[in-house]
Amino acid sequence: MDMDVQQVKLKIKRWEHAFIAEHNRPPDKDDIRPLTEMKQLYKLYSVLKSKERKAEPIQKQQTPRKDSNMVLGPTPQIYGKAVSIFEMKVSPLKVEETPTTEVEEDIESEIESSVNRRNSDEASANEEKLGIHSVKKRLFESPKKTENTTHLAVPQVTRYGPNSPLKLAQTVSIRQHLLTPKKKKAEPKSLYTPSPLLKRNSSKTLYELAHEHLQYVEEIKELDQQFKSEIVPIRHGNGQDIGDESDEVPEKKKRRTGVLRRLQFDEDENDRTIKKDLHKELLKLKSRKVKEFLGKEDNEPSEEEEEEQQKSEPLPVKKKKPKKYNLVSNNFRRLKLPKKNRNPRFGRRR
């Protein structure tokens, strides 16, 4: 039974729609395998479709080409090569030259005409002297400006400057024949070679460096322990809490806020006694010896009695004299207020 591709496709689509309406999902390979009829239809459809593809030749769709003069667009190209703005034949001061092909054709035509003219008519002696070289020379000469001509004449120049845009043809031909760069030949070595690096045998291994690091860490720990042991413990209350480690706090130096005063220690009883004058004591001893020599009685008190009298007598206490007036100037000194004629260095507030 010969069937068309469209007929096979129609049967397959009808069955698929019926399957979707029944099961609410498209058919899978597992659903097609048990159905031999549908399996054959799928195979037949694939065979017919492959035959159609082979029969129809593939035609590439090409855009029609337009025969137009070459124009440099936003991405300028010339002879199939990308051209930069510095390589384009664009110059505001010069007009484009005539192409070389037209010049060569003009030269050949003029040569042929001159030869025919020489054969047909006997030209004058001046015309006979003119040859091919004279014709070429006359063509390449710069045209002279006439009164009616308004455009600028372009001289025929064979050599161009290094930055001239008219060197495009030369640069393109050079680029087309570039070769891959080759390594240069071995250059002769310099006469003086650098001095070799000295080997340092004193360099340490990783194991030695790690061992030194551990030693440094242990030394730092020992110093920290010594510093902690030197901290003076603060005593609270009676001397019972001296051994507690919790009371050990490092002493902090208090910041000096006021005027420095000398520390006054409590004087002992021995220091509070009046010191004896040596000169007076010597005079007493001399007078006592003289009286003993003369046989006179000494009615003066002894040294022990004098010491007892001195101890019994209380020392005079110095009393502060009351100030006469509570002057306002005291506030200047106490509060360090600025005065008119004082030195600004002293008595400043901190």
UniProtKB/Swiss-Prot annotation:
Signal sequence interval, chain numbering: none
Cystines in this chain: none
MF terms (GO), sorted A to Z: DNA replication origin binding; single-stranded DNA binding
Acidic residues biased stretches: 102-111
InterPro entries: DNA_rep_checkpnt_protein, Sld2
A GO biological process held by the record: double-strand break repair via break-induced replication
Domain of life: Eukaryota
Subcellular location: Cytoplasm; Nucleus
Record keyword Cell cycle present: yes
Extent of Basic and acidic residues compositional bias: 118-128, 290-299
Similarity remark: Belongs to the SLD2 family.
Protein name (Swiss-Prot/TrEMBL): DNA replication regulator SLD2
Organism of derivation: Candida glabrata (strain ATCC 2001 / BCRC 20586 / JCM 3761 / NBRC 0622 / NRRL Y-65 / CBS 138) (Yeast)
